[in-house]
A protein has these predicted regions:
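Structured secondary-structure scaffolds
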Residues: 1-6, 12, 47-290
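Long, charged N-terminal interaction/targeting segments
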Residues: 3-6, 15, 34, 39
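A short-motif feature that recognizes glycine-rich, charge-decorated loops
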Residues: 17-31
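Amphipathic alpha-helical segments in well-structured domains
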Residues: 28, 32, 253-256
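Phosphate/diphosphate-binding loops
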Residues: 30-55
Length: 290
């Protein structure tokens, strides 16, 4: 937002635990009060008011997400736009709306953030010198050989100096501690499974228009300028009777065995065979009584 408005921004104010730096004040509780009191202290406070609004929450813990300014690694997707559009136009879809949806999603993406701050996953195996990437060709080859011989965990198991060849030791190089976005990982599955061949079909749910379908196309166009698949088949999802995603935490999972006992198995089979697989299906009494 600051970049869009050409505003200067300084050092990140939050630590990795969501507290104001140098304090134990959590940003959503004591931290807010601290900032308000400081504003009042300098006569900069205007108004305190409670309002109800929508705010992003973590889907697992159901707690608010805090935003933090961090350095990341990005792919500039504008450089791939022409190649992606060209290849996408050659792909066959089981429904035209899915072509339009995927094309629109990819057209609206400008950057792909490749780095993650997680304790698990594939390492983003680059070295840094004074905060900037330092990876000459011979060092790239050295790292690739290490991973080929020892597996990707070698990056986590050894310190920076032990990973470096003699030529680059004692130069102040440090390994990057980030991991790679899992969609980049899964999106390159075409390389290990088919290498230069195209898959006849990729089949997944509609959520993969922003996931695997997209990341597979991007990585394949990056690597050898062609789509990894000839056809995309997209299916809908089985939802609860209210049209909500089934979830153990929500307690709204419909057990097919319960349906079978209540209506018999043939009714369950016939009901599911009667729906259009490209659309979402509400699983409830209404479906089986029809």
């Amino acid at each position: 937002l600051c970049k869009q408005l050409n505003l200067e921004y300084g050092e990140e104010l939050l630590d990795n635990d969501g507290c104001l730096k140098g304090t134990n004040l959590y940003c959503f509780t004591e931290g807010n009060l601290y900032v308000m009191n400081k504003l009042k202290e300098f006569n900069l406070f205007v108004k305190d008011e409670k309002l109800e609004h929508s705010y992003p929450h973590d889907w697992r813990t159901k707690t608010p997400v805090f935003y933090k300014l961090t350095k990341q690694f990005f792919v500039d997707l504008n450089l791939l736009k022409d190649g992606v559009n060209n290849q996408l136009s050659k792909v066959e879809f089981n429904h035209s709306r899915y072509y339009n949806r995927l094309k629109s999603m990819m057209g609206n993406r400008k950057l792909w953030c490749l780095s993650r701050q997680r304790s698990w996953g594939l390492p983003l195996a680059v070295f840094l010198k004074e905060g900037e990437v330092f990876m000459p060709k011979d060092l790239q080859n050295h790292v690739m050989n290490l991973v080929e011989e020892n597996g990707s965990n070698v990056w986590f198991n050894k310190n920076s100096e032990d990973l470096l060849p003699e030529k680059y030791k004692n130069m102040g190089l440090v390994k990057c501690e980030y991991t790679v976005d899992v969609w980049f990982d899964s999106g390159t599955s075409w390389h290990s499974v088919l290498n230069d061949k195209q898959a006849d079909v990729y089949l997944e749910g509609s959520d993969q228009h922003r996931g695997w379908f997209q990341s597979s196309l991007l990585t394949s166009v990056m690597y050898h300028s062609k789509a990894p698949y000839k056809k995309l088949v997209t299916h809908g999802f089985v939802l609860d009777s209210n049209g909500q995603k089934m979830s153990k935490s929500l307690g709204n999972v419909v057990d097919p065995l319960d349906v079978s006992k209540k209506y018999n198995t043939d009714v369950l089979r016939l009901s599911l065979l009667s729906v259009d697989y490209v659309n979402d299906v509400k699983m409830g009494d209404g479906l089986f009584k029809t």
